[in-house]
Amino acid sequence: MDPAELLKKYQPQDFKVLTADPQVTAARFSPCGKVLVGGGYDARVRRWNFAIGDLPELPALEGHHGWVEGLAFRAEGELLFTADSWGQICCWSGYTGDQPTIKWKVDNAHDGWIRALSLSPDGKAIASCASDRFVRLWTTEDGVKQFEFPQTPQQNLSVLFAPDGTFFTGDDRGLVRHWNVNGTLIRQFDASSLYMLSRLQDVGGAFVLALDKSGTTLAVGGTKPQGGGTVTGVPSILLFDVATGAEKQKLELGTVNDCYVADIHFHDEGFLSVVTFGTPGAGQLLYIRPEDKTPFLTEKKMANCHSLAWHPDGKRLAIAATNGGSNGNGRPVDKDGKYVANHSPIHVFTLPS
């Protein structure tokens, strides 16, 4: 389908803005589409009811100790998996209900910030990666550790299961590894163009991973770094052939102030939807076909986007972003002298299709 036809079908239309205060790191739809879940900076797991037209908020889930960044669902048994910056993983049962319960938790699943979770295709295992440089597999039914992979030289930022049961990890130097669940390394993908050392600062890395529906093309998102400190860089995606490890395409998606690709989704119609974050106030929603050099949709009205989630019905889209005039350095205070915290507007769109 050509870009004009795709845009006609998938042009986002404003529906509602939900507010998460303080911010959420990401927001994801449950497989049934009844609930949108966000991982909070305040250690809460926020939920919104998408089975009701005005999208009311459901009671938050409490039990974490730090930022909740890892989110994954298993439809069977309505299990929600969450992970935080203190190294804890929780499994919640009944995520669409008013009071989900903790089925199990592992307080010290990792020694440090858990950056991502991914569910195996058969629903029996959950993979986690963290700042301690370990990747671990856990049994979804009881949280027992199935396997621990050898500690990698650098911390891993991303983890993603493939349809065939193998999985990928991406580290902060831009090296992506393809693993069997028995610990065998299948191959490596060189995404080091998404990394630079700026004095003592590591900038970039394999920030986000995505696969097309067939599992044959791997997208690695991050930035083409230009400088450290207040990071500048061009949001970039590298597309690799999974079978060979060869880089097929590089997509550069903005200016040096747009910085990072935050999230990627391969649509069944063959295009990628992407959100980015950059210098305070810079955020983009982009649609681009892998074979093209320029997006056929560029929307810049949202600031510093964190995540992008397509509803299972294909007719709605939710993007977690940052409030305008966000406080990035801690200086602004209110009339009482208190720190002004940021919040997350979650933009909900409907789609013509």
Where are these regions (language model features)?
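WD40-repeat beta-propeller superdomains and closely related acidic/aromatic-rich repeat-like regions
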Residues: M1-S353
